[in-house]
A protein has these predicted regions:
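Protein-protein interaction/assembly regions in multi-subunit complexes
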Residues: 2-191, 195, 200-240, 251-271, ...
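Extended C-terminal regions of large enzymes
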Residues: 152-156, 161-192, 198-538
Length: 538
């Protein structure tokens, strides 16, 4: 049991096999040592056993808040999803924003632990400190968007006001190894195959109704001082400043042009470090231009709204709307997730600079519940394998930048409907092993790299290699210093000092993931503000 501020001391352990729900507190020593969020969630997963089958009923799926979740602390709407990954075979934790983390805290919970496997599809309904399993047979097979609509219609609540849902799509239901969990239509626990684990448990969704259990600081004065200082630094930052900073104006995709200019944008399955270097080396048509899919271009042409997560003044989410023709059919697509990582993987790395096609594919990936980074990178891997004749025996191949085929393949990957879709759904490690395609796989521990070329950013290369959840930019975000100059500018191409830099960011992000607050706080505030808010709350 713990009486630390910021905690409800209330965790639900849900046995999906039997349908039983037990409630337990949090050990005081664990709360102090592991903090919450990622720290506590990974401990639950580790204690559950390291030899479990990731897709077996014995694997644990943990949704965990941190002590700052749902408070006034800036950008404190995050939630950690922790499990053993079917993609990498090791521990993973994946975080998403939006409002579900805060609402879970307000409903009286610090976390939800799912074990076992339901005989039939179910969803978990969470309200006022209790969890109830309900039939989800009518939701099974639906995409995420239709699932969200059905959930909202079936409950006395409204998204954006007092209701949140975290759901899987066909990707999770069918065991795509990089399937993800989608929160409120477009915020993703994207990496590591959390959606695959959720699908293996026949758990379609977790629905959370807001309550009134708002966290109260143990030391209001200390917390308020830390919070106010943090907000001031966020407002003054060139990166996070509301309506002025690059992240606020253009979202994460502000990095597209910056990475391109410094030759740090993996292009053509990482063969090149920018679209202009690809064009210079191979002047034959078609060449592509990263600027066409940049945050600046998106803002100027297809931006329609800028919603935000709980307690966030930055509003990095960029909602877009496009009218796009696919196979003679015109579609209108509106979505909130035109992120840099997604745009890189489905764009330059796949030799695609069709801005609107990327918006369509991001929205479709979210609906199917598959990670945009791994999906785009698997498409790029398939394109290079096609070029090298490694897929000649299949009835389907994929050419560079073939957006029509890319869009169709998303469905085939999630549903595993074609030979190529079934192959790519296995993830890079298994494809490389089955097809002798290790040279085509840009992955560490079976998870593909993000949108920062390690040849141009040595710190990021160390980060990919040492991340415990596979290739990951978020474990230790060295581009903060290597691109943005925060806390100070370093030469991205030099090795000296990069191990120390990477370790610094890995430690910092372990803390923010456990609080659980957004890493973008670190673009403005520092450890002093973190400590003041944590000490004041607990």
């Amino acid at each position: 049991m713990t009486d630390l501020g910021g905690f409800n001391d209330h965790v639900a352990r849900v046995d999906l096999t039997s349908g039983d729900v037990r409630y337990e507190g949090i050990d005081e020593e664990d709360a102090r040592k592991y903090i919450g969020g990622r720290g506590l969630g990974v401990k639950y997963v580790f204690d559950n056993g390291t030899d479990v089958d990731p897709e077996g009923p014995e694997n644990l799926l943990a949704f965990m808040n941190g002590p700052l979740t749902g408070t006034q602390a800036p950008m404190s709407g995050r939630i950690a999803v922790c499990t053993k990954s079917p993609l990498t075979g090791t521990v993973t934790d994946s975080h998403h924003g939006g409002w579900s983390g805060a609402r879970l805290k307000w409903s009286g919970f610090d976390g939800l632990l799912f074990e076992g496997r339901a005989d039939e599809p179910v969803y978990a309904y969470v309200e006022d400190g209790e969890v109830e399993l309900r039939d989800a047979s009518d939701l099974w097979g639906m995409g995420v968007h239709d699932t969200m609509d059905a959930i909202e219609e079936g409950h006395d609540g409204q998204f954006g006001k007092n209701l949140s849902a975290m759901a899987i799509g066909p990707g999770g239901e069918n065991g795509t190894k990089y399937a993800c969990i989608i929160n409120e239509d477009d915020r993703a626990s994207g990496r590591g195959g959390t959606g695959c684990v959720m699908g293996s448990k026949n758990l379609k969704a977790v629905v959370v109704k807001s309550g009134t259990k708002m966290p109260k600081p143990a030391d209001p004065e200390t917390f308020t001082e830390g919070y106010q200082q943090a907000m001031q630094l966020i407002r003054e930052s060139d990166v996070t400043g509301p309506n002025e900073g690059g992240l606020s104006l253009y979202g994460t995709n502000v990095l597209m042009n910056l990475a391109e200019e410094m030759d740090g944008l993996p292009t053509r399955n990482g063969r090149y470090t920018s679209t202009h270097s690809e064009a210079e080396d191979d002047p034959s048509e078609p060449n592509i231009d990263a600027e066409k899919v940049s945050g600046e271009n998106v803002r100027e042409n297809i931006l329609v709204d800028e919603p935000t997560c709980h307690s966030c003044p930055v509003a990095c989410k960029k909602e877009t709307e496009v009218t796009y023709e696919h196979k003679g059919e015109e579609m209108n697509v509106r979505g909130e997730s035109y992120e840099y990582e997604s745009a890189y993987a489905l764009g330059p790395n796949s030799m695609n600079d069709d801005r609107d096609s990327i918006a369509v594919m991001i929205n479709r990936c979210n609906d199917l519940g598959i990670d945009t980074i791994d999906t785009g990178n698997m498409l790029a891997m398939a394109m290079e394998m096609t070029e090298q004749g490694k897929l000649d025996d299949l009835d389907d191949e994929l050419e560079w930048g073939d957006t029509e085929h890319m869009i169709d393949l998303l469905e085939e990957i999630a549903h595993q409907e074609s030979d190529l879709g079934e192959l790519l759904a296995k993830g890079p490690r298994r494809v490389a092993e089955e097809r002798d395609a290790h040279d085509n796989s840009l992955a560490v521990k079976g998870q593909t790299i993000a949108a920062y070329d390690p040849r141009a950013m040595k710190g990021m290369g160390i980060g990919y290699a040492t991340s415990n959840r596979g290739a990951c930019h978020l474990r230790g975000y060295t581009p903060s210093a290597e691109i943005l100059g925060i806390p100070e500018k370093v030469d991205p191409t030099e090795w000296e000092g990069k191990g120390e830099l990477c370790a610094l960011f890995q430690d910092l992000h372990a803390i923010s993931d456990s609080f659980d607050i957004c890493k973008f706080n670190a673009f403005a505030e520092g450890i002093d503000e973190y400590v003041a808010q944590y000490n004041g709350m607990t």
